[in-house]
C-alpha cells in the first residue's frame, strides 16, 4: 500500500462533491487525483496477474453504502456495473473499512476481490483499496 497515497484518496474529492447524486457530479482536485491514479496504475503493473484496482469510499449521506472513488486502468469488475458506482457494502469490504483485509469471490466464481484498508498518515482508514482478478483468465476492459 505504500504506493497508494491515503492523503490523496482522502482529499482528491473536493468537499462540495463528497455528497453527490452521481459520479458525474464529482469535482476532483486534479493533482491529488493524478497522484492516486498513478499509485493504482503502479500496483497493476507490479502484479503478475491481470489485476484491476480501485479505491472505494464510504458515502457520508448513505450509511452502509460505498462508491468507487477512482479506478486504475479498468473498473474492478466484481462490484461495478454500468451506471452503478454506489453499492451496498459487501462483507469483505466492510471488514477492510474496519481495518482488516478481506477477500470475496463472486457468486459465479468468476472474480476474486481482495480489499485492503487505505490509511492516511494518522492511520485513519480513509478508503479501501480493491484488487480484483478474473479467475477464468478474462481480460478487463481498458478505459
Language model features: what each stretch is:
Residues 33, 37, 69-107:
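Extracytoplasmic/periplasmic sensor domains and loops in membrane signaling proteins
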Residues 131-143:
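Helix-start (N-cap) segments at beta->loop->alpha junctions
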Residues 119-129:
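Short hydrophobic/glycine-rich mini-motifs in sensory/regulatory modules
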Residues 49-51, 109, 127:
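Envelope-exposed proteins and targeting segments
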Residues 37-41, 115:
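Extracytoplasmic/secreted envelope proteins and their assembly/folding machinery
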Residues 1-33:
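Extracellular/periplasmic ligand-binding regions of membrane signal-transduction receptors
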Residues 108-117:
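A short beta-strand signature within small-molecule sensing/ligand-binding domains used
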Residues 41-65:
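Short N-terminal helix-loop-first-beta-strand/juxtamembrane motif that initiates sensory/input modules
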Amino acid at each position: 500500500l505504500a504506493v497508494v497515497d491515503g492523503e490523496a484518496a482522502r482529499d482528491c474529492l473536493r468537499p462540495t462533491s463528497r455528497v453527490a447524486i452521481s459520479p458525474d457530479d464529482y469535482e476532483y482536485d486534479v493533482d491529488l487525483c493524478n497522484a492516486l491514479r498513478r499509485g493504482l496504475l503502479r500496483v497493476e503493473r507490479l502484479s503478475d496477474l491481470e489485476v484491476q484496482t480501485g479505491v472505494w469510499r464510504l458515502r457520508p449521506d448513505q450509511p452502509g453504502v460505498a462508491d468507487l472513488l477512482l479506478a486504475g486502468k479498468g473498473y474492478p469488475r466484481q462490484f461495478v456495473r454500468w451506471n452503478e458506482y454506489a453499492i451496498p457494502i459487501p462483507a469483505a469490504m466492510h471488514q477492510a473499512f474496519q481495518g482488516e483485509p478481506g477477500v470475496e469471490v463472486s457468486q459465479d466464481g468468476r472474480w476474486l476481490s481482495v480489499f485492503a484498508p487505505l490509511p492516511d498518515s494518522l492511520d485513519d482508514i480513509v478508503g479501501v483499496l480493491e484488487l480484483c482478478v478474473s479467475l477464468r483468465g478474462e481480460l478487463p476492459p481498458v478505459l
